[in-house]
Regions:
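Short, Lys/Arg-enriched N-terminal segments with co-localized hydrophobic residues
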Residues: 3-16
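Compositionally biased, low-complexity repeat tracts
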Residues: 7-9, 20, 59, 177, ...
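Intrinsically disordered, low-complexity segments enriched in polar/charged small residues
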Residues: 9-12, 52, 143, 188
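Active-site beta->alpha loop and helix N-cap motifs at the rims of alpha/beta catalytic domains
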Residues: 18-27, 32-163, 169
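Catalytic alpha/beta core domains of metabolic enzymes, predominantly
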Residues: 145, 157-192
Length: 192
């Protein structure tokens, strides 16, 4: 993940949260499961140690590489607890949210914060194409559900079939205090 975080501190209501940890290489870690589709705790812990030893500055749990879509929420919570425990403060753990509904996304964001995630990264909804206003409200509502936690937008048009517009990203960044950055995998340099 490239550091593209932006803070707009000119607004009086902007939350002053610590975003100093959002930098460097944040690896989207794999989720290692056994034949019963349960997270293999020993292997997951070993992978956390491996990437930290390799020099990463953060771990993204349950991003696209982490195959979030194949796990039940309780297993994601268990996996996050394992990764946060194993990271033991050496690097921050980010939590990837890739749910279609706003309600489920808010529930996952709250669960992630409760279990030690330093930030959340939110993919735009897949399998449908929301209007501008629907997408704006989706991201805003999720951010407001965890107001003291940094939130990164995740633009992945290859997975969802549409891109986040520059106008949408700019409006969210200016109007929602804890939306502080974005991971963009569009490959479109005009989006930066």
């Amino acid at each position: 993940m490239i550091d593209r975080s932006i803070q707009y501190n000119s607004r009086k209501d902007h939350l002053q949260m610590d975003t100093s940890f959002i930098k460097g290489v944040v690896v989207p870690i794999l989720t290692i499961c056994d034949k019963d589709e349960k997270i293999d705790e020993a292997k997951q812990r070993a992978q956390v140690d491996y990437v930290i030893k390799g020099g990463v500055t953060g771990i993204l749990a349950f991003g696209s590489n982490g195959e979030f879509y194949m796990l039940e929420e309780d297993e994601m919570e268990r996996g996050l607890k394992i990764m946060v425990d194993q990271a033991a403060g050496r690097v921050p753990v980010y939590f990837g949210i890739g749910a279609i509904s706003t309600k489920k996304s808010c529930r996952l964001a709250k669960m992630a914060v409760k279990n030690g995630a330093a930030a959340v990264s939110v993919l735009q909804p897949m399998f449908l194409k929301p209007t501008y206003d629907e997408l704006y409200n989706h991201f805003k509502t999720i951010a407001e559900s965890v107001p003291e936690t940094p939130m990164l937008l995740y633009n992945n048009p290859g997975r969802v079939g549409y891109t986040l517009s520059a106008k949408l990203v700019e409006e969210l960044a200016h109007n929602v205090p804890n939306i502080i950055g974005m991971k963009d995998t569009s490959g479109d340099i005009t989006q930066t």
